[in-house]
Each structure stands twice: as structure tokens, then as C-alpha cells.
Design a protein with these regions (language model features):
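Bacterial N-terminal signal peptides that target proteins for export
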Residues: 1-5
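Bacterial Sec-dependent N-terminal signal peptides
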Residues: 10-37, 176-185, 199-202
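Extracellular and analogous surface-interaction loops
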Residues: 28-30, 72-84, 156-162, 169-174
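Post-signal-peptide N-terminal segment of Sec-exported extracytoplasmic proteins
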Residues: 37-79
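Short, solvent-exposed S/T- and G/P-enriched segments that are highly enriched in secreted/extracellular
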Residues: 62-82, 123-138, 151-152
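Mature extracytoplasmic domains of secretory-pathway proteins
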Residues: 64-117
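C2-type phospholipid-binding modules
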Residues: 106, 110-131, 135, 144-147
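C-terminal partner/receptor-binding element of secreted or periplasmic proteins
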Residues: 128-201
């Protein structure tokens, strides 16, 4: 079962993490597998006023980029190697001409993994921003630019034993706010529903 282990605040969004450790008796040794998950979701208005480039760390440790063309972006990656570091950041850049208006801006960013270990244990952990947080209202180009600069970075490192801790991943952004913290129930349920797992496991 998944259980919330932490809940902390962040300047722009509330960030959190949850973990699961199946402590049943040890089973016959099996091949170790690890699946990494990344999710970015934005409100409809974000793509009207900004360009979104998803920056993430893949299973080899390489930093890759993909342009976000719809309001939801999901990536699943497989590896058999631990330790590993995961990280994601939605780089949000205001469009060159943003007309005055009533924009509701929101980005939800989450990252997690499931490790099925050789000793038979299965460990899940994840980190992300609060999907229930209210959007930010913006009326001017300056408002939009200020909001774009606050897109959070989510990063974690998984030890060779399969357990994660929050870590800083440098994507070269110009905002020094931290994005640490653990996955509580709301973000846990949202995240599992996005990656095809049962939200009731939270």
C-alpha cells in the first residue's frame, strides 16, 4: 500500500512524495526492473500564452527535451540499473505577443518510479506539485512572464537498494526555488491515474 511520508510547501505550488514498500517475506530472486514515470499537465490557457518545453532525465542519465503540444505530457522509461537519478522541468516561455486578458495558468509536474528488486520487494515513490492547487490569474504579459519563471523542478535519486530521496537536478533555469518534498494523497492519486495504476493504492 502507498502511504504519504511527507508534505511540505513550495513558493508557487505545494509539493509532496509518497512511497510504498512491500515487506512481505522474501521471494525467489528475480530479475531487477525499474520503471520511471514523468507527467506534466497544464491548463488550457498556458498553451495560448506560452511555449512549453519538457526537460527530463532519461534512464541513462541523459538530459533530453521535448516540445509540449497538448495540455498533457506523459513519459515512461524502463531500465534494470540502480542507482539512478530522475528529474523533470517544464520550461515555460511566454509567447512574443501576449494580449491583455483573463488567463488561468497552472502547471502540475510529477516524477516517480517503481522498482521491482531482485529480492522480491517492490518499491514505489514519487514527487510532484499539487494537482488540486488553484490556478494563477494573469491579465498582462508581465503577469504571464512572472508565472512562467516559477515552473518547478522535480528531482530524485534512487539508491541501489531501491529507495529514493529528493535531489536537485540542474536544468539551467534562472529560478533558485527548491522543489523538494513528498507525494501526499492528492498528488499520489492523480499521478497513479495518469500512469495507469490504481489510485486506490494510495
Amino acid at each position: 500500500m502507498l502511504a504519504a511520508i511527507m508534505f511540505c510547501g513550495f513558493t508557487v505550488t505545494v509539493l509532496s512524495a509518497c512511497s510504498s514498500d512491500n515487506d512481505d517475506k522474501t521471494e525467489t530472486p528475480q530479475e531487477q526492473t525499474v520503471k520511471m514515470f514523468y507527467v506534466v499537465e497544464v491548463s488550457d490557457d498556458v498553451l495560448k500564452v506560452a511555449d512549453v518545453e519538457v526537460n527530463y532525465v532519461d534512464q541513462t542519465g541523459a538530459k533530453l527535451k521535448e516540445v509540449m503540444t497538448s495540455k498533457e505530457w506523459i513519459k515512461a522509461l524502463d531500465t534494470k540499473t540502480l542507482p539512478l537519478t530522475g528529474g523533470i522541468w517544464a520550461k515555460i516561455t511566454p509567447k512574443s505577443a501576449v494580449a491583455p486578458g483573463d488567463y488561468q495558468l497552472k502547471v502540475t509536474t510529477a516524477a516517480g518510479y517503481e522498482a521491482k528488486l531482485a529480492n522480491g520487494k517492490s518499491v514505489f515513490d514519487g514527487y510532484g506539485s499539487d494537482p488540486e492547487a488553484a490556478p494563477t490569474a494573469a491579465q498582462t504579459a508581465e503577469d504571464v512572464a512572472a508565472w512562467c519563471a516559477k515552473s518547478p523542478i522535480v528531482g530524485f535519486t534512487v539508491s541501489k537498494e531501491g529507495y529514493a530521496k529528493e535531489t536537485k537536478v540542474d536544468f539551467g533555469r534562472n529560478d533558485d526555488d527548491d522543489s523538494d518534498n513528498g507525494l501526499a494523497t492528492d498528488i499520489c492519486r492523480w499521478f497513479l491515474s495518469k500512469i495507469g495504476y490504481n489510485p486506490d493504492d494510495c
